[in-house]
A protein has these predicted regions:
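Short amphipathic alpha-helix that is part of the acyltransferase structural core
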Residues: 1-32, 130
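Conserved beta-strand in the GNAT
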Residues: 50, 56-65, 72-77
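Conserved active-site alpha-helix within GNAT-family acetyltransferase domains
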Residues: 89, 101-106, 111-137
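Short, basic/aromatic recognition patches
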Residues: 32-38
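A short helix-loop-beta-strand connector motif used in the catalytic cores of GNAT acetyltransferases and
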Residues: 39-50, 129
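Conserved acetyl-CoA pyrophosphate-binding loop and the N-cap/start of the following alpha-helix
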Residues: 82, 86-94
């Protein structure tokens, strides 16, 4: 059975499992296995949701926000062995519900790697007049 939780103070096991999810999603490549970085990510997020199977974290997602008007959902991923079960959709639903209950009504995200089919049924639409951009630092 999959359970969903808001995480704000991860323990060492949580941190290891979250690092593994970042690596599995290929967002970090061979980047640092830095538990303190992950702890700051979790604590600095407006909300951070994990999906658990028993004691194992099998999915996650988070929102960043100014806490007043806008929020961005990011880092939504599910372990390959647990995909296609609605876990990512439930993570996003829980994040959106929290953001809306906190009064944040503009919620954005960048759908990567053909993930638009996940977000469309949850009410997200493409923005024809916008282009996602980023600036990388070294």
């Amino acid at each position: 059975m999959i359970t969903f939780h808001f995480l704000s103070d991860p323990d060492a096991a949580d941190l290891r499992q979250i690092i593994a999810l970042y690596r599995d999603a290929e967002w970090w490549g061979s980047g640092p296995d830095d538990p303190e970085l992950v702890r700051r990510i979790v604590r600095g997020s407006h909300c951070f949701v994990v999906a658990r199977s028993g004691t194992s974290i099998v999915g996650m997602g988070r929102a960043i926000s100014d806490g007043a008007s806008d929020a961005w959902i990011q880092d939504v991923t599910v372990n390959l062995d647990f995909r296609r079960r609605g876990i990512a959709s439930e993570i996003v639903r829980r994040i959106v519900a929290r953001l809306e209950s906190d009064g944040l009504m503009w919620i954005g995200l960048v759908a990567e790697r053909n993930t638009a089919p996940l977000y469309g049924p949850l009410g997200f639409e493409g923005m024809a007049d916008a282009l996602p951009m980023r600036r990388r630092t070294t």
